[in-house]
Swiss-Prot record:
Belongs to the RNA polymerase beta' chain family. HAMAP family: RNApol_bact_RpoC. One of its GO terms (biological process) is DNA-templated transcription. GO terms for molecular function: DNA binding; DNA-directed RNA polymerase activity; magnesium ion binding; zinc ion binding. This is DNA-directed RNA polymerase subunit beta'. GO terms for cellular component: DNA-directed RNA polymerase complex. Signal peptide: none annotated. It comes from the Bacteria. Its EC number is 2.7.7.6. Zn(2+) 1 binds at C71, C73, C86, C89. Binds 1 Mg(2+) ion per subunit. Keywords: DNA-directed RNA polymerase, Magnesium, Metal-binding, Nucleotidyltransferase, Transcription, Transferase, Zinc. PANTHER family: DNA-DIRECTED RNA POLYMERASE (PTHR19376), DNA-DIRECTED RNA POLYMERASE SUBUNIT BETA (PTHR19376:SF54).
Length: 1399
């Protein structure tokens, strides 16, 4: 008996252990097997007794009792009758919980089509039957008959007949000579009659025969679905339903409200409609009603079932009493409020609270201040148990009373409970994993949570009213994880870039900066001190100042651990700072013996972390914080309006620029330049002026003044704040005291008239009006882009969520090549910074001696990187996530260093999610940061390259001409200038623009900062290569060229117009030719005539008969006027790259190396072909829309991958032409460019992880002897498995090409249908999965969260491993026992196996 009572409290139903979940279409038999009874009446509950009606939607006989262990009529109550069925009300006596589990069903009087398989595109029923959706609907909704069996009549199989045609055919051929049906029964018969095997063979044969691409695609689609039905065991006729399942009543509750009204789930309404119509149809059939009435009723039944499954997918939306659309079963799953995202992936949490945060500068880094009231509530159960253990209360009720009265002993116990019990703090929005961290609570008075100032950067928190949530980890495992993995002291480095994120900011920085200033000529300069105590004494007695230059004997540690001393010239303040430095040989006093800006402090923290470890770093950070706050308070820095110094030369610069602008205006009036060029030049001049004034202002503010006594005065406090990195930026200072500069219109164009005043002088009304544009745009952008960025993060997380470190080494020899990124002649990302923390893919050798510096397979630390850079290595091949050959996840060697820990990455690390967060988080940060500069225009147009090394110039593909002005001009498109140092190592290479003026030539020596070449960034020239006289071809006034008079100037300039639009000039080919003395067109060296084709909008620079020399400009094409670039261009750009969208006017890329030839024009396109250098290849032809500027001439030589037409290349083209490595390099660089503009650091490996996920699919080009269909996209893994199988069987394997998918598409095509369904397009994903009978292997994170298991990452990964080992061991034991049993037949029965514990 006792045993039975015990069983009551822990029910014996074991948690199900499963490894995979399969989804398929439910057959009518299956639905009946789930059901506990048929629902015959639409009634729900009796409004007087509130008891469910029998056979109704809430029937207790079918679904179970309403109260635990009590039948409906009350005859049997309590436990002892468990399992008895009451004879009066037929209700089983059991737990009421079964009302959440038991299903019912409705027997339909006529079959109906399942709307998902009918309407969800592509229509599965339509594909199988090869009928259009329109025809299907006509049959289903009783408009047309379909011929099933034409017999000997002239009718065709599956011919549609209208009512009249049907009757006519019956009259003509007789009633039994053919079979035609209408409605879902007809479709069901058609589906049942399909012979899938025959159909598959037929389709394969058709595919082999057809030449048409469209037909091939259609057959492939049908073949795919036929195979899906064959392989999954689903029967096509199951897509037509004869039984509708009814979900358990507690999942669609009906709750009585006061006042006799009821709140009900919409599903009840939808089920009621179905039951009503079904019953009516049954009655009509029994009454033998006329066909037309029955048909109408059947149609209405079909509509009712449609609405139940997916309301609004077909016809009008069914609305409830209050005109609100009813939520159907599909809506329950879909969207943010659907089951997946609302309840499975995001759950509400108990044991949590939230409050406003305030700063807690006296806390240690691992602490947070928790209000007593909050702690008392959150830790209640712990307090109760402790009170009980101490004998202070005997019952829970008593304990509750004690706690409610807040007795003194309760506070003591709360202290005990809280000690060493971490809590989690979270600030929304949680953009990356540092948005939730664990702290040890300390109890405080008041009602606000206290937060340590140094973790604010990680949470992106400030104290202007932000709120934070507190969560309590309950189980011991959870507390352990919180302490070991999530404690704030364990998260010192940023997972996105490996830099410290626990970095002082604002006041702390200002205090440390003030502390480290050194000023000449203060009292006590040059005194010598040996101990800190002496310095303190001197400071106290005002013998020296904090900033006085003194000499100091520093006591440090040598490499061997013995104490060493050294003399330094420093200041008292810096010595105070030196006292908090850890004692370590690698961290000398020099580390802080300089002016400490924010960046310097960050560097010191990084050094301390690398050399002294985490504990020391945390202590150092806390000390440095206290020191900073204290000194900021001691310094008492403030500023007034006179601290904003307007530079003296401001008005001179403004007047000069004004006169320049006037000059440009004049040039425009004289017709020398176009409107666009004038605009560009004016904008350029004003932005240069703004820069100049800003520089002068900075010079003046930062200059050190002398006081009357001859010593240095205090530095300007605004400059201190900006220079230290505490607050403000040079851009803001420029607006305060320089000149506000150019403003942008909301469209992104720049207004030509700048704002000359600054905020100190005040703006005029017009200036103020102009500046409102920028401010308004900034605020609007912020709101929009926060949402966009959040969505980008969601897509990234979704595509990468199953990327986990699953092995230590995949053993691949592949890798990608890394070199420094150089932009406009400056190194923006050094080689060292790009390879740090990555694994070398091959031995790295010193170029001069060929000695191995770093052997392959080494994880590169700082020391290795230094050695590589010292040796002058230009290119390093490293392992990458892109080339990792692991089937599931990524291996640790290919990933490299875990950036947040600075150590090799651990097994089970969810690198995909970290990558997604690292890329998404700054997106939101940046989007919120656009309007800080008030829309002040910042233009960056590159117009020169300069050397950043000393060395010698060598030129590859040299082509330089001297034009009639005597200037050297670059005449070829692929000229590369390389700078070689004294050892002959190539330090850097620059590609020179066509038409650039060269400042150096082959063999010149060059100094750092010297210009190599210059060009006009706003125009593209067309140059002549020969000397001679100009002639025009097909340049006909009014047809292909027009003298446009500029209205405002009255000056004519000649512009090529679109000659095809003028009707008469369709066959013209406008060109400029260069003729010799004999009047014939000259020949070029490379072959072909000196004929230069012109494109639309080219502006002529020469006239007929003028003499030209090589390098002279014949015509120029103006490029677009400058637009401002801020992350607005940025975020959509990043999304565009990750979505792999084709850019609007994509570049056209040469698919092969060869010679350009112009062919005959085609309608309104120009035809260009490439004659390949490799004669075995076919020539390639490109049609280029008119108006696109082709900057190549007939006979130019191009390399594979060169641009024929400028623009942004489509990533798919790069993949097809240049391969995966080039594509990855392109995507990484483009995405990094956007973030770099904003000064955001993201490690390349994060972007590589996402790109890897975008390259998971292969398009089958030739199916070989495999089951795959050519033209279909399959998973890489699947593709390889199929090919391995084919090779084993000696068949011909398939070939395929990698396909690049955008992140949304890639997410929807993952192997897990759970993950895809919870992302987007739920209906479509589930329909497809059901038809295919897909199995979800539950490998990713999302799927496991959805089914409620531990995720296979982090600590969950080790659990999964243990489980795997246990399973294997059990299998071995079982096999052993079976062997034994086979040998000894009469052995006693084996005891039951020890199964691994269920999760």
């Amino acid at each position: 008996m006792n045993q039975e009572i015990m069983n009551l409290f822990n029910p014996t139903t074991p948690a199900q252990v499963f490894d995979q979940i399969r989804i398929s279409i439910a057959s009518p038999e299956k639905i009946l097997s789930w059901s506990y009874g048929e629902i015959k009446k639409p009634e729900t509950i009796n409004y007087r007794t509130f008891k469910p009606e029998r056979d109704g939607l809430f029937c207790a006989r079918i679904f179970g009792p309403i109260k635990d262990y009590e039948c409906l009529c009350g005859k049997y109550k309590r436990m002892k009758y468990k399992g008895i069925i009451c004879e009066k009300c037929s209700v089983e006596v059991t737990l009421s919980r079964v009302r959440r589990e038991r299903m019912g069903h409705i027997e339909l009087a006529a079959p109906v089509a399942h709307i998902w398989f009918l309407k969800s595109l592509p229509s599965r029923i339509g594909l199988l039957l090869d009928m259009t959706l329109k025809d299907l609907e006509r049959i289903l909704y009783f408009e047309y008959y379909v011929v099933l069996e034409p017999g000997l009549t002239a009718l065709k199989d599956r011919q549609l007949l209208s009512e009249e045609e049907y009757l006519k055919a019956q009259d003509e051929y007789g009633q039994d000579s053919f079979t035609a049906m209408i409605g879902a029964e007809a479709i069901r018969e058609l589906l049942r009659g399909l012979d899938l095997e025959k159909l598959e063979a037929q389709l394969r044969a058709d595919m082999a025969e057809t030449d048409s691409d469209i037909k091939h695609k259609k057959f492939a689609k049908r073949l795919k679905i036929v195979e899906a039905f064959r392989n999954s065991g689903n029967k096509p006729e199951w897509m037509i339903m004869t039984v509708v399942p009814v979900i358990p009543p507690d999942l669609r509750p009906l709750v009585p409200l006061d006042g006799g009204r009821f709140a009900t789930s919409d599903l009840n309404d939808l089920y009621r409609r179905v039951i009503n119509r079904n019953n009516r149809l049954k009655r009509l059939m029994e009454l033998r009603a006329p066909d037309i009435i029955i048909r109408n009723e059947k149609r209405m039944l079909q509509e009712a079932v449609d609405a139940l499954f997916d309301n609004g997918r077909r016809g009008r939306v069914i609305t409830g009493a209050n005109k609100r659309p009813l939520k159907s079963l599909a809506d329950m799953l879909k969207g943010k409020q659907g089951r997946f995202r609302q309840n499975l992936l995001g759950k509400r949490v108990d044991y949590s609270g939230r409050s406003v945060i305030v700063v807690g500068p006296e806390l240690k880094l691992h602490q947070c201040g928790l209000p007593k009231k909050m702690a008392l509530e959150l830790f209640k159960p712990f307090i109760y148990s402790r009170l009980d253990a101490k004998g202070l209360s005997t019952t829970v009720k008593q304990a509750k009373k004690l706690v409610e009265k807040e007795r003194p002993e309760v506070w003591d116990i709360l202290d005990e409970v809280i000690r060493e019990h971490p809590v989690l703090l979270n600030r929304a929005p949680t953009l990356h994993r540092l948005g939730i961290q664990a702290f040890e609570p300390t109890l405080i008075e008041g009602k606000a949570i206290q937060l340590h100032p140094l973790v604010c950067a990680a949470f992106n928190a400030d104290f202007d009213g932000d709120q934070m949530a507190v969560h309590v980890p309950l189980s011991l495992e959870a507390q352990l994880e919180a302490r070991v993995l999530m404690m704030s002291t364990n998260n010192i480095l940023h997972p996105a870039n490996g830099q410290p994120i626990i970095v002082p900011s604002q006041d702390i920085v200002l205090g440390l900066y003030y502390l480290s200033i050194m000023r000449e000529g203060l009292a006590g300069e040059g005194k010598v001190y040996g101990e800190m105590a002496e310095i303190e004494h001197a400071l106290y007695s005002k013998v020296i100042h904090l900033h006085t230059k003194i000499k100091y004997r520093w006591h440090g540690v040598g490499e061997d651990g013995k104490p060493v001393t050294k003399w330094y010239e420093t200041t008292a303040g810096r010595v105070m700072l030196g006292q908090v430095l850890p004692n370590h040989p690698k961290i000398p006093f020099d580390a802080i013996n300089k002016l400490m800006t924010k960046r310097e402090i960050s560097g010191v923290i990084d050094q301390v972390y690398r050399h002294c470890g985490q504990k020391e770093t945390v202590i150092f950070c806390d000390r440095i914080m206290a020191l900073g706050f204290h000194n900021a308070f001691k310094a008492g820095i403030s500023f007034g309006k006179d601290d904003m110094v307007v530079p003296q030369g401001k008005w001179k610069v403004v007047d000069d620029t004004r006169s320049m602008a006037k000059e440009f205006e004049q040039q425009y009036n004289d017709g020398l330049i176009t409107q666009g060029e004038k605009y560009n030049k004016v904008v350029d001049a004003w932005s240069k002026a703004t820069e100049k004034i800003a520089d002068e202002m900075m010079k003046e503010i930062s200059s050190v003044k002398k006081t009357t006594k001859g010593n240095e005065a205090q530095i300007n406090s605004i400059y201190m704040m900006a220079h230290s990195g505490a607050r403000g930026s040079p851009a803001q200072m420029r607006q305060l005291a320089g000149m506000r500069g150019l403003m942008a219109k909301p469209s992104g164009e720049i207004i030509e008239t700048p704002i000359i005043s600054n905020f100190k002088e005040g703006l005029s009304v017009l200036e103020y009006f102009n500046s409102t544009h920028g401010a308004r745009k900034g605020l609007a952008d912020t709101a929009l882009k926060t949402a966009n960025s959040g969505y980008l993060t969601r897509r990234l997380v979704d595509v990468a969520q199953d990327c986990i470190i699953n092995a230590s080494d995949c053993g691949t020899n592949l890798g990608i090549k890394m070199r420094a990124i150089v932009d406009a002649g400056t190194v923006v990302a050094s080689l060292g910074s790009r390879i740090l923390g990555r694994t070398a893919c091959e031995d790295i050798r010193e170029p001069s001696t060929n000695n191995v510096i770093v052997p392959r397979g080494t994880l590169m630390e700082e020391s290795h990187v230094d050695a590589i850079q010292r040796a002058g290595v230009q290119e390093v091949k490293i392992r990458s996530a892109l080339t990792c050959e692991l089937v599931n996840g990524i291996c640790a060697m290919c990933y490299g260093r875990d950036l947040a820990r600075g150590t090799p990455v651990n097994h089970g690390e969810a690198v995909g999610v970290i990558a997604a967060q690292s890329i998404g988080e700054p997106g939101t940060q940046l989007t919120m940061r656009t309007f800080h500069i008030g829309g002040a225009a910042q233009i960056n147009e590159q117009s020169f390259v300069e050397s950043n090394f000393d060395g010698k110039v060598t030129i590859r593909n040299r082509g330089i001409a001297t034009n009639s002005e005597g200037a050297s001009v670059a005449m070829v498109r692929n000229m590369v200038v390389a700078i070689v140092d004294a050892d002959g190592t190539e330090r850097v290479t620059h590609r020179v623009q066509y038409g650039a003026r060269m400042r150096v030539d082959e063999g010149d020596t060059i100094k750092r900062g010297q210009r190599i070449a210059e060009w006009d960034p706003y125009t593209r020239p067309i140059l002549t290569e020969v000397e001679g006289t100009i002639g025009f071809e097909d340049l006909v006034e009014g047809q292909s060229i027009s003298e446009t008079l500029d209205e405002s100037t009255g000056i004519a300039k000649r512009v090529v117009i679109d000659w095809r639009s003028t009707g008469r000039g369709a066959d013209l080919r406008p060109a400029i030719v260069v003729k010799g003395k004999d009047g014939k067109v000259l020949k070029l060296q490379r072959g072909g005539d000196a004929r230069y084709m012109l494109s639309v909008d080219a502006i002529l620079s020469v006239d007929i008969g003028s003499q030209v020399k090589p390098g002279d400009i014949l015509a120029r094409i103006s490029t677009e006027s400058a637009k401002t670039r801020d992350i607005t261009g940025g975020l959509p750009r990043v999304a565009e790259l990750f979505e792999a969208r084709r850019p609007k006017d994509a570049a056209i890329i040469a698919e092969t190396a060869g010679t350009i030839r112009f062919g005959r024009d085609y309608k309104n396109k120009r035809r260009i072909s490439i004659e390949p250098t490799d004669k075995t290849e076919e020539p390639r032809e490109y049609l280029i829309p008119k108006g696109k500027h082709i900057h190549l001439q007939d006979g130019d030589i191009v390399e594979k991958g060169d641009f024929i037409v400028e623009g942004n290349p489509a990533p798919h083209d790069i993949l097809a032409i240049k391969g995966i490595e080039e594509l990855a390099a392109y995507l990484v660089n483009e995405i990094q460019e956007v973030y770099r503009l904003q000064g955001v650091l993201i490690n390349d490996k994060h972007i590589e992880v996402i790109v890897r996920q975008m390259l998971q699919k292969v398009e089958v080009t030739d199916q070989g002897d495999t089951d795959m269909i050519s033209g279909e996209q399959v998973d890489k893994i699947e593709f390889d498995q199929n090919n391995d199988k084919a090779k084993e069987e000696g068949k011909k394997p398939a070939t395929g090409t990698p396909v690049l998918l955008g992140i949304t598409k890639a997410s929807l095509q993952t192997r897990s249908f759970f993950s895809a369904a919870s992302f987007q397009e739920t209906t479509r994903v589930l329909t497809e999965a059901a038809v295919n009978g897909k199995v979800d292997p539950l490998e990713g994170l999302k799927e496991n969260v959805i089914v409620g298991r531990l995720i296979p990452a982090g600590t969950g990964a080790s659990m999964a491993k243990i489980r795997e080992v246990a399973m294997k061991r059990d299998k071995l034991i079982q096999d052993e026992r079976e062997k034994q049993a086979a040998i000894t037949p009469a052995a006693p029965e084996a005891e039951p196996l020890a199964l691994p514990p269920a999760e």
